[in-house]
């Protein structure tokens, strides 16, 4: 989990929607599997990989270094776009960044099937 801050409270929904368009793509079938979610817990906000969410639910999951790199890369990109700020001190634990995921533009969203790998609240 990467602790973040939002520029404005209403940015929560922007980040949540943007994350639905970031993940692993099957270009042939036009399916995108969402990698990360935004989590609010006790007044704090986090970018969380779906496997971390499953682990918090008590499920046995193996989170790979590739999963961590993807989560970190997504958080950095959201920060570059001005949607979030990564809390100071979090960067020291972040992995080397790579572009190992796909971002579907808002305009292309209707052309793709967007599939969350975790549903918050279920």
Swiss-Prot record:
- Name of the protein described by the UniProt record: Translation repressor protein
- Source organism: Enterobacteria phage T4
Q: What does this protein do?
A: Controls the translation of a number of proteins (such as regA itself, rIIB and at least 35 others) by binding to their mRNA.
Q: What are the DNA-binding region positions?
A: 15-37
Pfam families, per database record: Translat_reg
Per UniProt, which keywords does this protein have? Repressor, RNA-binding, Translation regulation
Q: Name one GO molecular function term.
A: RNA binding
> Which segments of the protein form a coiled coil according to its record?
none
The record's section on InterPro entries has: Transl_repress_RegA, Transl_repress_RegA_sf
Its GO biological process annotations read: regulation of translation
